[in-house]
Curated annotation (Swiss-Prot):
GO terms for biological process: DNA damage response; establishment of sister chromatid cohesion; nucleobase-containing compound metabolic process. It is found in: Nucleus. This is ATP-dependent DNA helicase CHL1. Keywords: ATP-binding, Cell cycle, DNA-binding, Helicase, Hydrolase, Iron, Iron-sulfur, Isomerase, Metal-binding, Nucleotide-binding, Nucleus, Phosphoprotein. Binds 1 [4Fe-4S] cluster. Residues 161-188 are annotated as: Disordered. It comes from Saccharomyces cerevisiae (strain YJM789). Its cofactor is [4Fe-4S] cluster.
Amino acid sequence: MDKKEYSETFYHPYKPYDIQVQLMETVYRVLSEGKKIAILESPTGTGKTLSLICATMTWLRMNKADIFTRMETNIKTNEDDSENLSDDEPDWVIDTYRKSVLQEKVDLLNDYEKHLNEINTTSCKQLKTMCDLDKEHGRYKSVDPLRKKRKGARHLDVSLEEQDFIPRPYESDSENNDTSKSTRGGRISDKDYKLSELNSQIITLLDKIDGKVSRDPNNGDRFDVTNQNPVKIYYASRTYSQLGQFTSQLRLPSFPSSFRDKVPNEKVKYLPLASKKQLCINPKVMKWKTLEAINDACADLRHSKEGCMFYQNTNEWRHCPDTLALRDMIFSEIQDIEDLVPLGKSLGICPYYASREALPIAEVVTLPYQYLLSESTRSSLQINLENSIVIIDEAHNLIETINSIYSSQISLEDLKNCHKGIVTYFNKFKSRLNPGNRVNLLKLNSLLMTLIQFIVKNFKKIGQEIDPNDMFTGSNIDTLNIHKLLRYIKVSKIAYKIDTYNQALKEEESSKNENPIKETHKKSVSSQPLLFKVSQFLYCLTNLTSEGQFFFEKNYSIKYMLLEPSKPFESILNQAKCVVLAGGTMEPMSEFLSNLLPEVPSKDITTLSCNHVIPKENLQTYITNQPELEFTFEKRMSPSLVNNHLFQFFVDLSKAVPKKGGIVAFFPSYQYLAHVIQCWKQNDRFATLNNVRKIFYEAKDGDDILSGYSDSVAEGRGSLLLAIVGGKLSEGINFQDDLCRAVVMVGLPFPNIFSGELIVKRKHLAAKIMKSGGTEEEASRATKEFMENICMKAVNQSVGRAIRHANDYANIYLLDVRYNRPNFRKKLSRWVQDSINSEHTTHQVISSTRKFFSMRSLNSR
């Protein structure tokens, strides 16, 4: 297939909408023209994920086809390519290139595809038998000692015993403690991935055929070097649920082979990366509750004398039949994260480490934000982004996520509880701890007491900036000591032992008192292990940068916050061929340009804001110009505004929207919604409105109300859901069809300007403007723009919950006269802007609403 056909069809499994074609063409053009950044807004429900898959996979296969075609052409014409090769290349490499080894490469690729097809038609149990047979054909090398070890220890005691809580002996300041250092043999070095020109790509492909890359003589797998894909598509999203949705979408299209008829059935090599919490199959590790504890328990077990029966950090394990079988099963069809665990169990192979070994072969890799955005995590997982395509979905939260990854916070209460936990642990086990463990625990406890005293003595106001050197003034603690303590925490795995011991004590005490810990409390404790929080905070203390700042936050906390998210993001930009930032609500895009991409030339950035797939008549957005409806900080508590104008609007809207359809209203904060509810209840207005529509409202510590609201809507009784911007229901919930026929935004949800975080951010932004030669007026405008961007991003994210598919319909009501101002309207998503109705009074809005729904044939009850 030629390039024209590639770029026009994209192998979309259905007839694509115009905006899907527009998005696919934009992505393909960005990749073909070598642009660095694409910022794409495509509303939820418009098939964004599938469009991204089709465009990027089409380009990837086309790119590989181009390389293959040029290789064929060079070989057929016996073209001398030596001038494009390095002068120090040995003669045999050039001779090999000039001879027709290409056919051998093709044969190996074809053999591997046939091998994957055989696996795809075989059950997991049958595959294990097939692996035993395959070693006779030279594909795998049997490693009998590993098999015997795995078969010999199937029954495990997974209860928590006291021995589980005791660390191995630790020698203070000794380098011999670090059992985590190991070499990973049989891997290609980073330089082998740096393929910037066609000829370097050709050389690498040839190298992988005939041995320029060093091969392990114990490696019986003839496929692992042949099938590496240096150029990959990395797709990152916020949750594993979203990554699972990507997997289901990837199964829909079919893409042609990069090698046409020579390798006719080239499968998509898809690899879902996940954490040990999702993929671990060892009961001794799985019994721990938190990701941090699981990671430490895994490392502790792997480095113990007993070891893990599912994994060994050796080339022998990597090339044993079952490890290779699991790798190939991953690629035999498109597997979800949940599929990897039963596959690993059936073969007795760790799916977490086996999936990491499969990384070089993969074409498409999905991974959670943390894996992509943390440079240290990418390094530890050997994720090389060189010349690859990086797609970051749900990117509206990208800046906040980067800031969160590189920030840390610890409260006075956290420090006191951690101190108490260490004392409890130390008193219990001190006689069973070696001197190295005892000394370091005492040092750690002393450090905690120093931080406690610093907060008690120095906390004056939220947003007060802190010089980190002041925290330890007058103590014998310095940065070197903190480095040593961090190393102790990492090597000894003491954090999870102390945290889990104290949690076990709480559960035991609760059980004895016949007063079980509430499930919600247990979850909160296990999800925030205190000593892990402390170690993260200490890490920030030892890795100071000019882009971060320590300051006091509420609840007597010290927070370290990254102020320049563009700095850690630079490493991704520098390595990747292209970075695609995609989301349903990406406006205002100026936030990305100023905060994340300040050094990227505008010519290298492409932006696209798509309209919705629904017909224009399926959506109306109303803004009233009634001056009474202005929810500024000074006016929003007004009894007249709350009890008269706001209340009457909801009564009128509740009557205008058919009862079969639900109404979802978003309020700027829990505090304000609680104030409104209280006012309405004091004068029976709440009961009056509740008689028109059953009211469900979100409370900060309340129970889940979504199921009750959904049931009420399904029964057609008329339902009103009052939710919070940034709350549990404003993101990730699909209010499609009758769940939301009207979405109301009450006021403009500006963030709290008195929070320590915003005080420091605004001060930093103003200082940066002034330092670059700006005026005070320019600094003031920049901080105002910063606050507006936060506000409007929240608005777009909330109202985007309403329309979820092509046949859906709903109305949006922006209930504040300030939405009429150009600076706010221009920051609405394009599809919302294009649907704005010019009605002015609430009476006109309600009248137009009745007409809208009368045309939709909704049954009114």
